[in-house]
């Protein structure tokens, strides 16, 4: 019997709705990965509602929880670590301590960093120290880096002038250490308004993918978290980076189709679960080079 992969997911959690681990854990489980959720914050709901309750996990709890797993002899079974929203830079450094601990036991373990830097216009606010940590420390340790356009701009220190400029900015990130950069949302001058575009960049090649942009009265939250989680899950299940990229685009689109059909503000993960595991749509990425 083929072994089921195990993944430690260290990011935010909301009691109601879907963001962070609440957007990523169930879909990763649904495609066949055992997920160990470690919640960096626990909020009542995501911050775009304008109000929320909850608290940030104390940084020292992260390595303590990792050591607790080690104490029962299970840490070596961890095949990958996913990190997302951070409440503080100290939390981020605690995560890197955990990543190093896991990689010392299992050198093949992968680390995907979703460098959430905040989007004030959407109500997602991240302290500057977190952005600095992601730029200066986390990127160097990550096997996979999954920024959106705003985060890519922050890494590059500028805005793109074209699609090929986005590609150049993502390629420059490879020099910081990651094996691959997945840009979860592209935005650049001249981009067609009816499409949603993503980019995968590796040392071996780069691919661009465009899918239809769906209209919502209020844009659902958690799409980036869902994207990062599914991409890493599919890699653990044996997909090539390109196959994982294309599968993720299809599965995320299926979730958004179901969410749109329900006129829902929250992602309809449960209703779309079969389509997450077995997408009916398919998107083919196009090779792109400078």
From Swiss-Prot:
Complex formation: Homodimer.
InterPro entries referenced in this protein's UniProt entry, alphabetically: PM/HMP-P_kinase-1, PyrdxlKinase, Pyridoxal_kinase_PdxY, Ribokinase-like
Organism: Pseudomonas fluorescens (strain SBW25)
Protein name: Pyridoxal kinase PdxY
Similarity field: Belongs to the pyridoxine kinase family. PdxY subfamily.
Role description: Pyridoxal kinase involved in the salvage pathway of pyridoxal 5'-phosphate (PLP). Catalyzes the phosphorylation of pyridoxal to PLP.
GO annotation, cellular component aspect: cytosol
Swiss-Prot/TrEMBL catalytic activity: pyridoxal + ATP = pyridoxal 5'-phosphate + ADP + H(+)
EC number: 2.7.1.35
Binding site for ATP: 114, 151, 184, 211-214
Domain of life: Bacteria
Molecular functions per Gene Ontology: ATP binding; magnesium ion binding; pyridoxal kinase activity
Signal sequence bounds: none
The keyword Endoplasmic reticulum is assigned to this record: no
Cofactor: Mg(2+)
Pathway annotation: Cofactor metabolism; pyridoxal 5'-phosphate salvage; pyridoxal 5'-phosphate from pyridoxal: step 1/1
Annotated positions binding substrate: 12, 47-48, 225
Keywords, sorted A to Z: ATP-binding, Kinase, Magnesium, Nucleotide-binding, Transferase
Gene for this chain: pdxY
Pfam families: Phos_pyr_kin
BP-aspect Gene Ontology terms: pyridoxal 5'-phosphate salvage
């Amino acid at each position: 019997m083929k072994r089921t992969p195990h993944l430690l997911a260290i990011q935010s959690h909301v009691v109601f709705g879907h963001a962070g681990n609440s957007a990523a854990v169930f879909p990763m489980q649904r495609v066949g990965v055992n997920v160990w959720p470690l919640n960096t914050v626990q909020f009542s709901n995501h911050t775009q509602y304008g109000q929320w309750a909850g608290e940030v996990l104390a940084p020292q709890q992260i390595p303590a929880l990792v050591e607790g797993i080690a104490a029962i002899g299970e840490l070596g079974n961890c095949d990958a670590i996913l990190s997302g929203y951070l409440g503080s830079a100290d939390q981020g450094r605690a995560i890197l301590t955990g990543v190093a601990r896991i990689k010392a036991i299992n050198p093949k373990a992968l680390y995907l960093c979703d460098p959430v830097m905040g989007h004030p216009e959407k109500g997602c606010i991240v302290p500057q120290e977190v952005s600095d940590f992601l730029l200066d420390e986390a990127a160097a340790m990550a096997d996979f880096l999954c920024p959106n356009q705003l985060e890519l701009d922050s890494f590059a220190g500028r805005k793109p002038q074209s699609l090929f400029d986005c590609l150049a900015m993502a390629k420059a990130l490879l020099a910081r250490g990651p094996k691959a950069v997945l840009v979860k949302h592209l935005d650049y001058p001249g981009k067609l308004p009816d499409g949603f575009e993503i980019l995968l960049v590796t040392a071996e090649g780069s691919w661009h993918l465009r899918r239809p942009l769906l209209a919502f009265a209020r844009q659902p939250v958690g799409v980036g978290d869902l994207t990062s989680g599914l991409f890493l899950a599919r890699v653990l299940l044996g997909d090539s980076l390109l196959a994982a990229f294309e599968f993720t685009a299809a599965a995320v689109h299926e979730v958004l189709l179901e969410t749109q059909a329900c006129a829902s503000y929250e992602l309809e993960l449960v209703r779309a679960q079969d389509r997450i595991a077995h997408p009916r749509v398919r998107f083919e990425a196009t090779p792109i080079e400078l």
